[in-house]
């Protein structure tokens, strides 16, 4: 699902909000979440999951075209850990489809 598809679904489901209002709310939420992670903070949405940063240590990688070794610097990467309610819901829907 893309951001525009999410906006469409919310507008259709909600009915009271315009697509511009929903678009602004989603863009604002994503921007605030990005800023929060950029400063090293953790985001927790109970029942859904949490976003945090994980550190990837420096390592030696390979250039896939040449096979040459390349030194990769350490970096922080965003990490999402689903909450129990989200995991349970996903597993319920998987079992219903099987």
Swiss-Prot record:
<comment type="subunit">
    <text>Heterodimer of an alpha and a beta chain.</text>
</comment>
<dbReference type="InterPro" id="IPR005685">
    <property type="entry name" value="IHF_beta"/>
</dbReference>
<dbReference type="GO" id="GO:0006355">
    <property type="term" value="P:regulation of DNA-templated transcription"/>
</dbReference>
<dbReference type="GO" id="GO:0006310">
    <property type="term" value="P:DNA recombination"/>
</dbReference>
<keyword id="KW-0233">DNA recombination</keyword>
<keyword id="KW-0238">DNA-binding</keyword>
<dbReference type="InterPro" id="IPR000119">
    <property type="entry name" value="Hist_DNA-bd"/>
</dbReference>
<dbReference type="GO" id="GO:0003677">
    <property type="term" value="F:DNA binding"/>
</dbReference>
<keyword id="KW-0810">Translation regulation</keyword>
<dbReference type="GO" id="GO:0005829">
    <property type="term" value="C:cytosol"/>
</dbReference>
<dbReference type="InterPro" id="IPR020816">
    <property type="entry name" value="Histone-like_DNA-bd_CS"/>
</dbReference>
<comment type="function">
    <text>This protein is one of the two subunits of integration host factor, a specific DNA-binding protein that functions in genetic recombination as well as in transcriptional and translational control.</text>
</comment>
<dbReference type="Pfam" id="PF00216">
    <property type="entry name" value="Bac_DNA_binding"/>
</dbReference>
<dbReference type="GO" id="GO:0006417">
    <property type="term" value="P:regulation of translation"/>
</dbReference>
<dbReference type="GO" id="GO:0030527">
    <property type="term" value="F:structural constituent of chromatin"/>
</dbReference>
<dbReference type="InterPro" id="IPR010992">
    <property type="entry name" value="IHF-like_DNA-bd_dom_sf"/>
</dbReference>
<dbReference type="GO" id="GO:0005694">
    <property type="term" value="C:chromosome"/>
</dbReference>
<comment type="similarity">
    <text>Belongs to the bacterial histone-like protein family.</text>
</comment>
<keyword id="KW-0804">Transcription</keyword>
<keyword id="KW-0805">Transcription regulation</keyword>
<protein>
    <recommendedName>
        <fullName>Integration host factor subunit beta</fullName>
    </recommendedName>
</protein>
């Amino acid at each position: 699902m893309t951001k525009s598809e999410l906006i469409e679904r919310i507008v259709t489901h909600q009915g009271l909000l315009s697509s511009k209002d929903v678009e602004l709310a989603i863009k604002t939420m994503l921007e605030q979440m990005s800023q929060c992670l950029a400063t090293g903070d953790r985001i927790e949405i109970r029942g859904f999951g949490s976003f945090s940063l994980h550190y990837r240590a420096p390592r030696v990688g390979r250039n896939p075209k040449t096979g040459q070794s390349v030194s990769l610097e350490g970096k922080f990467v965003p990490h999402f850990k689903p909450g129990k309610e989200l995991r349970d819901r996903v597993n319920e829907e998987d079992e219903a489809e099987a």
